[in-house]
Amino acid sequence: MQEAAGLRPIKMSASLIDSAYERLVEAIATGSLQPGERLTQEKLAARLQVSRQPISHALNRLRAAGLATGAGRRLVVAPIDSRRLGELYQLRAAIDGLAAQLAAEKISAGNLARELSPWIDILTRNRDLEDVAPTLDWIRADVRFHDAIYRLSCNSVLIDTVEPLWPHFRRSMGNALSEQRRRSHTRSEHRTIANAILEGRPKDAENAARYHVESAYSAAVEAGLTIRE
């Protein structure tokens, strides 16, 4: 049987807890773990080929992030709260707009340190995403693209504010990015944002980033997410 996306075995790494948490978030984002599905330590440990301890810690992080609900052995994937999701996207529109504006301003003024050049490379590469790729690859590319903009803003408070919210955005984009039409829109919108930043046009970058977030939210809703009113 083909291994479910996001639940591949974990290789030994510096932090098994982080790896386990990341795999579980990806599995929820791609729908491999559905809302209401039981999260059993033994089964997840077997799937990821790790001991139960990192799974236990990862499940606690999922619950703290709002992606799992329940207690003890009755932990399940949390349903999507449509009202809260809308509020999260509303906040993200403001944050992403500011991040894109700040990044464009720094590029325009030539104030970016050399160590930030890898983030510029990510913006350049992500302008030309291919339609034909697994949904999980698209989600990862999307996360890298937006993370690059946050890093280029050089605003640590902004980064610390938005990072904890991204597991929810990854979850909402899973269904939307499985559709070719949304992938085409995403690639086009990313290209518009990246061009505005790299050409040092702060206002255009802000507007493009805000539009992209609003478009992403509409696509997530239209994709028919299972939501809790």
Regions picked out by a protein language model, each given a short descriptive name:
Residues S178-R182:
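Solvent-exposed loop and edge beta-strand segments that line ligand/cofactor-binding
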